[in-house]
Structures are given as structure tokens and as C-alpha cells.
Curated annotation (Swiss-Prot):
Annotated PANTHER family: 50S RIBOSOMAL PROTEIN L32, CHLOROPLASTIC (PTHR36083), LARGE RIBOSOMAL SUBUNIT PROTEIN BL32C (PTHR36083:SF1)
Record-linked InterPro entries: Ribosomal_bL32, Ribosomal_bL32_plant/cyanobact, Ribosomal_zn-bd
Subcellular location: Plastid, Chloroplast
Keyword list, A-Z: Chloroplast, Plastid, Ribonucleoprotein, Ribosomal protein
Homology family: Belongs to the bacterial ribosomal protein bL32 family.
Gene Ontology CC: chloroplast; large ribosomal subunit
Residue intervals passing through the bilayer: none
Annotated spans, Disordered: 1-20
Top-level taxonomic group: Eukaryota
Entry's Gene Ontology molecular function annotations: structural constituent of ribosome
Protein name (Swiss-Prot/TrEMBL): Large ribosomal subunit protein bL32c
Gene Ontology process terms (BP): translation
Length: 59
């Protein structure tokens, strides 16, 4: 016979939520750091094309 599951406590729910938030903060800060390095032309491991090169090749 089917038995309902026990309810998750508030503290456990908050702990899981905080772990998820910390993961997202870490990922967001990495993405922001990469964006800053690209904008300041300091990125050494990320290759990209600039608009100047694209516009010169089309003309």
C-alpha cells in the first residue's frame, strides 16, 4: 500500500537552497571574470573575432 513520504524539514530545505546558491554565485563570478578579461583584452585562453576584422573582410 502506498505511504506518503515524510516532510522535509525547514532547516534541511534551507541548507540545500544555500548550497545551490553558493554554486550559482561561483559560476556567475567565473563568467563575470571571463567577461572582464575579454573586455580589457587580457584573456590568453579565449579566442574570439572582433567586429573590425569581420567588417574589413566583408568590404
Amino acid at each position: 500500500m502506498a505511504v506518503p513520504k515524510k516532510r522535509t524539514s525547514k532547516s534541511k530545505k534551507r541548507i540545500r537552497k544555500s548550497v545551490w546558491r553558493e554554486k550559482t554565485k561561483k559560476i556567475a563570478s567565473k563568467a563575470f571574470s571571463l567577461a572582464q578579461s575579454i573586455l580589457t583584452n587580457r584573456s590568453k585562453s579565449f579566442y574570439y573575432t572582433t567586429n573590425e576584422k569581420i567588417s574589413e573582410s566583408t568590404e
